[in-house]
C-alpha cells in the first residue's frame, strides 16, 4: 500500500501539477486567481471562501504533495504511516478543500450525488482525499452515495481505486494497457460497496485514515454544505437526474412565442428543440454555463410553452459560476493569463507530466477534457477519464461512475496524461468531475474548464471531449460540453495553455520527418507509427474499448465513439488550434508523441478550423479498420470550423481516416435533425480514395459498415499538413441524428484517401440517421453519402433536401454558412471530398447514381474549402438522379477540382436531363496539385484550412513526377491539359482526361456543361459537351444576375450569377447562392466568360499574354484573363506550353500545373487560417527543366503594399498563377496586370507556416514587375513568401519558409534552391536566391545602405520616396532601434529633415514604386498624382540617376553589375554567400533594369522584382548591416540597392561567405567580399 500510496502520491503530484496548470489557468480565468493559485496546487476549483480558509491546509497539503512528488520522483515506497499522515493532512486539507470543492464542485453536482448536499460534500471530501492521495491519480471519482457510510466506503473504494489507478496509471505510464482501469469505472454504488471491501483489503492504513478523514470530512462537509449549500449542486444533480426545480438555467434565456419555446444559450445560440439542445450540449465550443451538472436536458429544457419560465435555483452553482467567468468569457483571459500560471504550473506539471506523459501521451484526454462549470477542471479530468473509460468500454451507467470512468480512462495513456493534468483539478473538484461528467455544463463549469481544461485541452482539443459527455453515464443526458469548451475560437488559447505542456513534451518529438521534407522518411515513420499504434495503441485502446480504442490524439481527437468522435472533432479543433499554435505533435496512440510535420502547425488555430485530422496511424486499428468511421460532429461553434485547420492542423498526414467507432456514439451530432433515410442513403460518406496516398490509410479508412452513426470522416492520411476533413461544423448539428454512413470496410479502405467530412450541416443532413446502404461496400456510395454529408456540413446553412424522387439536394445556404466555398471564411465548412474509387457509381436511393470521383481533386480540394455537394438522386431537375456517370462525373469533378481553388460547388451530373449537382469543389480539388492548398484567403483567417489531400501531397510529389509523365492514357487533351488534373488521371484515365481543366471542357461533351462559379467571378464556366446542344436554351446572365436574354449562345459564354444555372430547357435554375460553387450542368454549351464569350483562338498559346484559356466543350477558348477579369484576379500566367493549365475560376484557386517536371517534392503551402493565400507550387516541376520554368504561383490575396486586410474574399483570395513560362515567355504585363488584380501578397502568417512554399515568381498581375509579395502585415512572411520570379521562374520556386521560424521548410528550400540557383547564376537571372538566405536563417528586416533610395510611409501616404541618410549629428540611435534607419523624404521642399523609420516599414525603390503604382491604381480617384508626391518621385529618380551614374559608371543593363560591397559593421552572420550571391544577382538584375523595377520590363524587371521581393535576397549595407544582423526575420528584398559607396571596394573579390551552400555557387558569380561573420560585408547592389 505504501508503494501504492507512493505511486498515488506521485501520480497525484503529476495530476495536481497538470491540474494546477489547468487550474491556474482556470483560476486566472475565474478571477479567483489568488485562491485558486494556492488551491490550484491542491484543487483547481477552490472557488469558495473555504478555499481561502483552506489555504494553510492546502499549503500543507501542497507541501505533502511536494513530499509525495519527491517520493514519486524517487519512487520511494512510503510507509503506510507516512501515507496515513499524508492522508490525514489530505484529510484536513481535503475537508477544507472539499468544502471548497463542495462549493465549487457541488455546483457541478456529483453525478451520483443523490444524497444530501452533505453527502455530496463528503463525497467531495472523499474524492478530494482520494484525489489528494492520488493527486488526481484517481480519475474515477466515486460519487458518494447518499449514505455517509457509503461515502466512507467510497473513500475506501476511492483509496483502493486510487491505488488501483495508481498502479494502472503506472502501467499506463509504462504504456501497459490498463484494462483494470476500466473496471474502476464501475458504477459509483458498486464502487462504493466494492471499495468498502477492497479498500480495507487494499490498504488498510490508508483506508482507515481515509475513513477517519472521511468522517471528519463528512462532518465538516455537512457543516460546510449546510452553511454553503455546497450540496446544491449535488442536490441539483439529484434533481436533474429526476427533475429540475426550474426550466431556465442561469445565463440562459427562455423565450416563448406562438406556443413555441426557444432557449437562448449564454453565447446567443437559439435552440428550439430537444435535439438542438442536445446537439448543442454535445457540441464542443458551445457555452453551457449555468446548466446543472448532472444535466438531463429533457427535464431542464422544457419546450412546453404552457410552462412559465422558472429560473433554476442553483445557489452553489451560481456562486461557483459567478466567481469564475465563463469559459467563453475566459478564453481571452486564459489565453493570456492562463499561460502564466499554466506555464509555472506546467513547469512543475511538466516534470511530473513528462513522466506520466510518456504513459499518458496516447490517452485521448481530449475526449474528457471539456467540462463545464466550476467542476470544469475535475470535470475535464473526469471527462477525459470518462471518455477514456467510455473508450475503455468501461462506461459506468451512472453519472457518478463517470469519475470511475475517468479512472478507467487512465487505461489510455493519454487519459493518464490528461488525467494527470485533470487529476490535479480533480483533486480539487472530485465531485465536480462527476458532476462535470454529467453532460450538463453548469455555467460555472465552463469557467473551470478554462482552468482545468488548458492542459487537457492541450491534450484534447480545447479539452472538450464532446463525446465524453455523451459518453458520460450521466443519466444518459449526454451533454457534450466540449461544445462549451470548443465554443469560441478562444478555445485555442486554452488549448495553448494546455498545449504548452503537451507541446513542450510533444515538440521535442517534432523532429519526425516532415512529409514535405522527407516524404519517404515521413511515410516510413507514419507506417511505423501506424504499426506501432496498431500493436501498442490497439492494446491500450482495445483495453479501453474495442472500438473506442482509437484514442483521440491531442491532434487527432478521434474519439472512440461517435460521441467521442464529436469530441474528437471538437478536440481536433482544439487540438488543431493548439497544434496550430504550438505545433503540438499529435500523440501517437502509443505513448509517444508523434511530431506532426511542421505543416501541421499550419492548421488554423481557429477553433473554427476543425481539422479532422486523424492520424490514421494513430488510430489505425489493424483489426478494426472499420471502426475508422469517425463521426465528425461539427461543433456548434459560432465560427464554422474547418478541420483545416488544417486545415489547420498540418499534422503529418493522417494515415488513417479518422477512426472512431461510431457504434459507441448513440447519435451522430452530424446528422441534422431531419435526416431522411434517402438523405442518409445519399449522404455519401466520403471514403478516402486509395489513390497514391499513404498505403496505411486504408487500414484506418476502413469503416465498419455497422458504424452507421459515424460518417467516416477520413482525412486522407496523406495530407499531413492539411486537415483533410474540413468540417463545417454547424452549431445546428442535430445531436440525435446519426448519419451512419457505413461503407463497406473494404470500400472504406479503398477510400482511405478521400477525406470524408461528415460534417453535419446544422440542418443539412436530414435528422433521421442516415443509414447508408453503403454496407454494400460501394465505396463510392459512401462517398456520395460523405458528399451529402459534406454538403450538409458544408452548407452549414446548407440544406440537404431529399426530393421525393429520392434525390439529395444539398443546397448550401450562402447566408447561413455561406456556401462553404463561398464563404472561405467558413473554411472547411463542407469538405466533402468524394474521393472514391474512380468511376464507381453508387446507386442512390432515387436510383440515381452518384459517381464517386476517384479523382482526389474534388475530395482533396473540397477539404480546404467547404464544398457543397449536391447529389442528384434521380429525378429532380436540380439534381439529376444520376449524379454523374462515373468517369464523366469524375471528369467534371476533376475539372472543378482544377478550378477547385475557390471553394466551388461542382454540379456533377452527366445527367441527360440536365440535373445539376452542385458540388462545392474543394479548392485543392485537383489532386494533381497536391500542393494546392486551398487556403481560403477569406477573412476567417483561423478558419482557413490548408487542405491538401494526402494524396495531393504525395501526389504532388509522385504525381508531379509521375502524373505529368503519365497524362491520362487516352486523352491527348488530358495530356495537353495541365497535369493538375492528370494526377487524378491515374485513377481513372478517361475520366481524368476529362477532368483536366481544358480536357474537362473538351470532355465536356460527355458531361454536360460545367459551370464554374467562383464567388468572386460569379460566373459559370460551362463546358458544353456539344455547343450545339440546346443553344436556344442558353440565357445570358449578367453578373448582376439579370438575364440579358435567352440567347442561343452555343459558343457564347453565359455569365451567370453565382447561383444561377441554366437548365437544359433554358430555364434558369438558381441554386442558392453558391458563390464558390461550380455548377456543372450536363447540357448547355455555355461557357462563362466575363465579357466576351470567346477568344477565337482554338489553340491555347502559352505565350499569349501568359493567359490561360478555358476551353469550352464547343472548342471555344476564352482567355482566362477575360474570363476572370474581375479583381478576383485569377492569376494564370501562360499555360504551360506542355499542357494548357486549367485556370480555376475561383479566385483562391491555385492552379499549379504539374508540368512534366516531376519534382518529387510537392511544395505545399500551408497557410495559416488567417492567410487566405496559399501558394501551391510544384516546386519540383520547376526543378524539372529550365525550358519550362517552374510554375509560378502568385499569391496575391492583397496588394502587398496595402495592409493585409481582406478587401473582399474574392480579391483577397490568393491568386496562384501557375505558369511554366519560359523565362520571360509570359509578358509580365499581360500576365501580371491582367492576372493579378491585387498585388501578390502572401500573408506573413502563411509564410510562417513552414509549409508555405512560394513557388517561384509571384505575378503581380497588374504590373509586369512582380509585386513584391511582401505581406504587409507580416514581416517574416514577406521573405518567406517572396517568390523570385526572376527570368527563370523555376528558380523562383523557393520554398521560402515564409517565416524564418519555419526553418525546416526553409532548409528544404535551401537544398532545393541551390540546384536551381546553380543553374540560375548561369542564367544570369541571378534571381536573388532569396530562398537560400530565407531558408538559412530568419532574415532580419531588410537593410538599407546609406544613400539608398527607398519608399516608406510618409506624409500620409503609404508610399513616399525617400533616401537613407546617415544618423544626424548629435543624435544617438538607441541600440534597440537597430531596425530603424534615418530616412530623408524627397519632396521636402529643401527641408532636409530626416526621420527615424523602422526598416520594416520601408520598401526598396522598386517595391515602393510598385506599391505606389498599385496604390494609385487602387485608390486614385483622379488621374492626377499628388504634386508633392510627383515631385518627390522625380527627385528620387534624379537622385537615383545620380547615384547610379556615380557609383556604377558602367551600369549597363547587362548582367555585369558592379557590386559595391559595403562592410556591414555588424552584418549578421546569416548573410551568407547565398545572400550575397543573391544580392549580386539582384544587383545585376537591378543594373540590368536599374529603374526597371518601375518599368514593366518583362523578364528582368519581374525577375528582379521577384528576386528582390523575395525576402531572402537582402543587400546589407553598412548602415543597415547592424539592422540586418539583428533582424533577418523580416527581410524585404531590396530589389534596388542604391549604394553611394563606390563599387570598387570589393568588386571582383568574389570572396563570399558561403553560409548557404546553395548560395556558394551563385556567390561565386557575385563579386564582393562578404564575411558571414557578425560583421559581414554585404554586397550592395550598386545600381
UniProtKB/Swiss-Prot annotation:
Residues 1415-1446 form a coiled coil. Residues 83-104, 430-439, 563-579, 679-693, 851-862, 1323-1333, 1474-1488 have a biased composition (Low complexity). Residues 238-308 form the MBD domain. Residues 1346-1408 form the PWWP domain. GO terms for cellular component: nucleus. Pfam families: PWWP (PF00855). Residues 81-115, 427-457, 556-579, 630-694, 839-862, 940-980, 1179-1247, 1287-1339, 1471-1497 are annotated as: Disordered. PROSITE patterns: MBD (PS50982), PWWP (PS50812). Keywords: Coiled coil, Developmental protein. Residues 658-677, 1179-1195, 1216-1240, 1287-1313 have a biased composition (Polar residues). InterPro entries: DNA-bd_dom_sf, Methyl_CpG_DNA-bd, PWWP_dom. One of its GO terms (molecular function) is chromatin binding. Residues 440-449 have a biased composition (Pro residues). It comes from the Eukaryota. Non-catalytic component of the polycomb repressive deubiquitinase (PR-DUB) complex, a complex that specifically mediates deubiquitination of histone H2A monoubiquitinated at 'Lys-119' (H2AK118ub1). Important for maintaining stability of the PR-DUB complex. Probable epigenetic regulator involved in developmental pattern formation and eye development. Component of the polycomb repressive deubiquitinase (PR-DUB) complex, at least composed of caly/calypso, Asx and sba (MDB5/6 homolog). Interacts (via MBD domain) with Asx (via PHD domain); the interaction is important for the stability of the PR-DUB complex. PANTHER family: METHYL-CPG BINDING PROTEIN, DROSOPHILA, SIX-BANDED, ISOFORM H. Named 'six-banded' due to its distinctive embryonic expression pattern. This is Methyl-CpG-binding domain protein 5/6 homolog sba. It comes from Drosophila melanogaster (Fruit fly).
Amino acid at each position: 500500500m505504501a508503494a501504492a500510496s507512493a505511486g498515488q502520491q506521485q501520480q497525484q503530484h503529476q495530476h495536481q501539477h497538470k491540474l494546477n496548470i489547468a487550474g491556474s489557468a482556470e483560476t486566472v480565468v475565474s478571477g479567483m486567481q489568488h485562491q485558486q493559485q494556492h488551491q490550484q496546487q491542491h484543487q483547481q476549483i477552490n472557488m469558495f471562501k473555504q478555499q481561502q480558509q483552506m489555504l494553510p491546509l492546502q499549503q500543507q497539503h501542497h507541501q505533502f504533495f511536494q513530499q509525495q512528488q519527491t517520493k514519486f520522483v524517487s519512487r520511494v515506497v512510503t510507509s503506510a504511516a507516512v501515507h496515513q499522515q499524508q492522508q490525514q493532512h489530505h484529510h484536513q486539507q481535503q475537508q477544507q478543500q472539499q468544502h471548497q470543492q463542495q462549493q465549487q464542485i457541488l455546483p457541478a453536482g456529483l453525478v451520483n450525488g443523490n444524497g444530501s448536499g452533505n453527502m455530496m460534500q463528503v463525497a467531495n471530501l472523499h474524492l478530494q482525499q482520494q484525489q489528494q492521495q492520488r493527486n488526481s491519480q484517481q480519475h474515477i471519482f466515486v460519487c458518494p452515495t447518499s449514505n455517509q457510510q457509503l461515502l466512507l466506503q467510497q473513500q475506501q473504494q476511492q483509496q483502493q481505486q486510487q491505488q488501483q489507478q495508481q498502479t494502472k496509471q503506472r502501467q499506463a505510464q509504462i504504456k501497459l494497457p490498463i484494462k483494470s482501469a476500466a473496471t474502476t469505472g464501475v458504477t459509483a454504488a458498486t464502487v462504493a460497496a466494492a471499495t468498502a471491501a477492497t479498500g480495507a483489503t487494499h490498504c488498510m492504513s490508508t483506508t482507515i485514515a481515509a475513513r477517519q478523514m472521511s468522517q471528519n470530512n463528512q462532518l465538516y462537509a455537512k457543516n460546510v454544505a449546510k452553511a454553503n449549500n455546497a450540496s446544491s449542486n449535488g442536490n441539483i444533480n439529484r434533481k436533474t437526474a429526476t427533475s429540475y426545480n426550474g426550466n431556465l438555467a442561469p445565463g440562459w434565456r427562455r423565450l416563448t412565442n406562438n406556443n413555441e419555446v426557444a432557449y437562448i444559450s449564454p453565447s446567443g445560440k437559439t435552440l428550439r428543440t430537444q435535439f438542438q439542445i442536445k446537439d448543442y450540449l454535445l457540441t464542443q465550443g458551445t457555452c453551457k454555463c449555468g446548466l446543472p451538472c448532472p444535466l438531463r436536458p429533457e427535464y431542464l429544457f422544457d419546450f412546453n410553452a404552457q410552462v412559465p419560465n422558472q429560473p433554476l435555483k442553483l445557489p452553489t452553482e451560481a456562486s461557483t459560476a459567478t466567481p469564475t467567468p465563463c469559459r467563453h468569457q475566459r478564453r481571452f483571459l486564459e489565453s493570456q493569463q492562463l499561460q502564466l500560471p499554466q506555464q509555472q504550473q506546467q513547469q512543475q506539471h511538466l516534470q511530473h507530466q513528462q513522466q506520466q506523459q510518456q504513459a499518458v501521451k496516447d490517452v485521448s484526454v481530449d475526449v474528457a477534457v471539456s467540462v463545464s462549470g466550476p467542476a470544469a477542471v475535475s470535470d475535464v479530468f473526469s471527462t477525459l477519464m470518462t471518455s477514456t473509460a467510455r473508450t475503455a468500454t468501461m462506461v459506468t451507467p451512472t453519472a457518478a461512475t463517470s469519475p470511475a470512468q475517468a479512472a478507467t480512462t487512465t487505461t489510455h495513456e493519454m487519459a493518464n496524461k490528461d488525467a494527470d493534468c485533470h487529476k490535479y483539478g480533480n483533486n480539487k473538484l472530485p465531485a465536480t468531475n462527476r458532476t462535470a461528467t454529467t453532460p450538463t455544463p453548469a455555467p460555472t463549469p465552463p469557467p473551470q474548464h478554462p482552468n482545468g481544461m488548458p492542459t487537457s485541452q492541450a491534450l484534447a482539443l480545447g479539452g472538450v471531449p464532446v463525446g465524453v459527455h455523451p459518453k458520460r453515464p450521466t443519466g444518459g443526458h449526454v451533454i457534450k460540453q466540449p461544445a462549451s469548451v470548443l465554443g469560441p475560437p478562444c478555445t485555442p488559447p486554452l488549448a495553448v495553455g494546455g498545449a504548452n505542456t503537451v507541446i513542450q513534451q510533444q515538440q521535442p518529438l517534432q523532429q519526425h520527418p516532415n512529409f514535405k521534407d522527407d516524404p519517404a522518411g515521413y511515410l516510413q515513420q507514419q507506417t511505423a507509427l501506424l504499426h506501432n499504434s496498431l500493436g501498442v495503441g490497439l492494446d491500450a485502446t482495445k483495453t479501453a474499448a474495442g472500438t473506442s480504442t482509437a484514442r483521440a490524439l491531442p491532434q487527432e481527437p478521434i474519439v472512440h465513439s461517435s460521441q467521442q468522435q464529436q469530441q474528437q472533432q471538437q478536440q481536433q479543433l482544439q487540438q488543431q488550434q493548439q497544434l496550430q499554435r504550438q505545433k503540438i505533435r499529435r500523440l501517437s496512440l502509443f505513448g509517444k508523441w508523434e511530431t506532426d510535420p511542421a505543416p501541421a502547425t499550419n492548421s488554423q488555430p481557429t477553433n473554427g478550423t476543425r481539422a479532422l485530422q486523424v492520424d490514421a496511424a494513430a488510430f489505425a486499428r489493424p483489426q478494426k479498420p472499420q471502426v475508422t468511421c469517425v463521426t465528425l460532429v461539427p461543433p456548434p461553434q459560432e465560427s464554422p470550423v474547418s478541420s483545416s485547420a488544417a486545415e489547420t492542423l498540418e499534422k503529418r498526414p493522417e494515415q488513417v481516416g479518422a477512426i472512431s467507432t461510431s457504434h459507441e456514439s448513440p447519435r451522430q451530432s452530424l446528422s441534422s435533425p431531419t435526416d431522411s433515410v434517402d438523405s442518409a442513403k445519399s449522404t455519401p460518406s466520403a471514403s478516402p480514395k486509395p489513390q497514391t496516398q499513404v498505403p496505411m490509410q486504408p487500414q484506418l479508412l476502413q469503416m465498419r459498415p455497422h458504424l452507421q452513426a459515424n460518417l467516416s470522416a477520413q482525412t486522407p492520411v496523406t495530407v499531413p499538413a492539411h486537415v483533410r476533413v474540413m468540417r463545417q461544423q454547424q452549431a445546428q448539428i442535430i445531436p440525435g441524428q446519426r448519419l451512419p454512413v457505413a461503407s463497406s470496410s473494404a470500400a472504406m479502405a479503398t477510400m482511405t484517401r478521400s477525406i470524408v467530412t461528415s460534417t453535419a450541416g446544422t440542418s443539412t443532413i436530414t435528422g433521421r440517421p442516415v443509414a447508408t446502404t453503403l454496407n454494400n461496400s460501394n465505396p463510392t456510395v459512401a462517398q456520395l453519402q460523405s458528399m451529402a454529408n459534406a454538403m450538409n456540413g458544408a452548407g452549414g446553412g446548407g440544406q440537404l433536401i431529399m426530393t421525393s424522387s429520392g434525390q439529395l439536394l444539398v443546397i448550401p445556404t450562402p447566408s447561413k454558412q455561406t456556401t462553404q466555398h463561398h464563404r472561405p471564411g467558413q473554411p472547411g465548412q463542407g469538405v466533402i471530398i468524394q474521393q472514391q474509387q474512380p468511376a464507381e457509381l453508387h446507386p442512390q436511393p432515387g436510383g440515381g447514381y452518384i459517381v464517386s470521383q476517384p479523382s482526389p481533386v474534388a475530395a482533396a480540394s473540397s477539404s480546404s474549402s467547404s464544398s457543397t455537394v449536391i447529389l442528384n438522386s434521380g429525378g429532380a431537375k436540380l439534381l439529376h438522379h444520376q449524379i454523374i456517370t462515373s468517369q464523366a462525373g469524375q471528369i467534371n469533378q476533376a475539372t472543378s477540382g482544377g478550378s477547385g481553388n475557390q471553394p466551388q460547388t461542382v454540379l456533377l451530373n452527366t445527367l441527360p436531363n440536365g440535373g445539376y449537382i452542385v458540388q462545392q469543389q474543394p479548392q485543392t480539388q485537383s489532386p494533381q496539385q497536391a500542393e494546392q492548398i486551398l487556403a481560403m484567403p477569406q477573412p476567417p483567417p483561423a478558419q482557413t484550412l490548408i487542405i491538401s489531400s494526402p494524396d495531393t501531397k504525395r501526389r504532388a510529389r509522385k504525381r508531379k513526377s509521375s502524373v505529368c509523365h503519365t497524362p491520362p492514357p487516352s486523352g491527348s487533351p488530358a495530356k495537353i491539359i495541365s497535369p493538375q488534373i492528370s494526377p487524378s488521371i491515374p485513377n481513372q484515365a478517361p475520366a481524368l482526361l476529362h477532368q483536366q481543366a481544358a480536357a474537362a471542357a473538351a470532355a465536356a461533351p460527355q458531361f454536360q456543361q460545367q459551370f464554374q462559379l467562383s464567388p468572386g467571378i460569379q460566373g459559370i464556366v460551362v463546358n458544353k459537351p456539344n455547343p450545339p446542344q440546346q443553344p436556344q436554351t442558353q440565357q445570358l446572365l449578367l453578373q448582376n444576375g439579370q438575364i440579358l436574354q435567352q440567347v442561343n449562345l452555343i459558343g457564347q459564354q453565359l455569365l451567370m450569377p453565382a447561383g444561377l444555372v441554366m437548365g437544359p430547357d433554358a430555364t434558369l435554375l438558381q441554386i442558392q447562392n453558391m458563390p464558390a460553387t461550380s455548377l456543372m450542368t450536363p447540357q448547355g454549351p455555355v461557357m462563362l466568360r466575363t465579357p466576351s464569350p470567346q477568344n477565337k483562338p482554338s489553340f491555347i498559346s502559352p505565350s499569349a499574354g501568359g493567359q490561360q484559356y478555358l476551353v469550352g466543350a464547343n472548342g471555344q477558348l476564352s482567355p482566362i484573363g477575360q474570363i476572370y477579369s474581375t479583381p478576383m484576379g485569377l492569376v494564370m500566367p501562360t499555360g504551360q506550353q506542355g499542357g494548357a493549365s486549367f485556370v480555376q475560376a475561383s479566385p483562391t484557386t491555385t492552379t499549379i500545373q504539374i508540368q512534366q517536371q516531376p519534382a518529387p517534392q510537392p511544395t505545399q503551402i500551408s497557410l495559416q487560417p488567417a492567410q487566405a493565400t496559399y501558394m501551391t507550387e510544384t516546386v519540383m516541376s520547376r526543378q524539372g527543366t529550365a525550358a519550362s520554368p517552374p510554375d509560378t504561383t502568385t499569391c496575391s490575396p492583397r496588394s502587398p503594399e496595402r495592409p493585409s486586410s481582406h478587401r473582399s474574399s474574392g480579391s483577397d483570395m490568393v491568386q496562384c498563377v501557375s505558369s511554366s513560362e519560359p523565362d520571360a515567355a509570359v509578358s509580365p504585363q499581360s500576365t501580371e496586370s491582367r492576372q493579378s488584380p491585387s498585388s501578390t501578397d502572401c500573408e506573413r502568417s502563411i509564410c510562417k507556416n513552414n509549409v508555405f512554399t512560394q513557388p517561384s515568381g509571384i505575378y503581380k498581375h497588374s504590373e509586369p514587375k512582380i509585386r513584391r509579395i511582401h505581406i504587409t502585415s507580416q514581416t517574416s512572411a514577406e521573405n518567406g513568401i517572396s517568390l523570385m520570379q526572376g527570368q527563370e521562374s523555376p528558380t523562383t520556386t523557393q520554398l521560402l519558409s515564409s517565416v524564418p521560424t519555419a526553418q525546416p521548410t526553409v532548409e528544404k528550400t535551401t537544398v532545393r534552391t541551390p540546384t536551381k540557383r546553380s543553374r540560375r547564376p548561369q542564367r544570369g537571372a541571378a534571381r536573388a536566391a532569396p530562398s537560400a538566405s530565407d531558408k538559412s536563417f530568419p532574415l532580419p528586416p531588410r537593410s538599407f545602405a546609406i544613400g539608398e533610395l527607398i519608399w516608406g510611409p510618409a506624409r500620409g501616404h503609404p508610399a513616399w520616396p525617400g533616401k537613407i541618410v546617415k544618423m544626424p549629428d548629435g543624435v544617438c540611435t538607441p541600440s534597440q532601434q537597430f531596425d530603424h534607419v534615418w530616412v530623408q523624404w524627397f519632396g521636402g521642399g529643401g527641408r532636409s529633415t530626416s526621420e527615424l523609420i523602422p526598416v520594416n516599414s520601408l520598401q526598396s525603390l522598386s517595391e515602393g514604386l510598385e506599391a505606389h503604382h498599385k496604390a494609385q491604381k487602387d485608390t486614385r480617384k483622379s488621374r492626377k498624382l499628388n504634386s508633392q508626391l510627383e515631385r518627390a518621385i522625380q527627385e528620387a529618380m534624379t537622385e537615383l540617376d545620380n547615384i547610379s551614374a556615380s557609383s556604377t559608371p558602367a551600369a549597363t543593363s547587362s548582367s555585369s553589375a558592379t557590386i559595391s560591397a559595403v562592410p556591414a559593421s555588424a552584418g549578421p552572420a546569416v548573410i551568407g554567400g547565398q545572400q550575397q550571391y543573391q544580392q549580386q544577382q539582384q544587383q545585376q538584375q537591378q543594373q540590368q533594369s536599374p529603374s526597371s523595377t518601375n518599368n514593366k520590363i518583362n523578364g528582368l524587371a519581374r525577375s528582379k522584382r521577384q528576386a528582390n521581393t523575395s525576402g531572402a535576397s537582402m543587400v546589407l549595407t553598412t548602415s543597415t548591416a547592424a539592422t540586418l544582423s539583428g533582424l533577418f526575420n523580416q527581410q524585404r528584398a531590396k530589389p534596388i540597392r542604391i549604394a553611394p559607396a563606390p563599387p570598387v571596394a570589393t568588386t571582383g573579390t568574389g570572396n563570399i561567405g558561403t553560409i548557404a551552400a546553395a548560395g556558394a555557387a551563385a556567390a561565386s558569380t557575385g563579386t564582393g567580399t562578404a564575411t558571414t561573420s557578425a560583421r559581414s560585408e554585404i554586397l550592395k547592389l550598386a545600381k
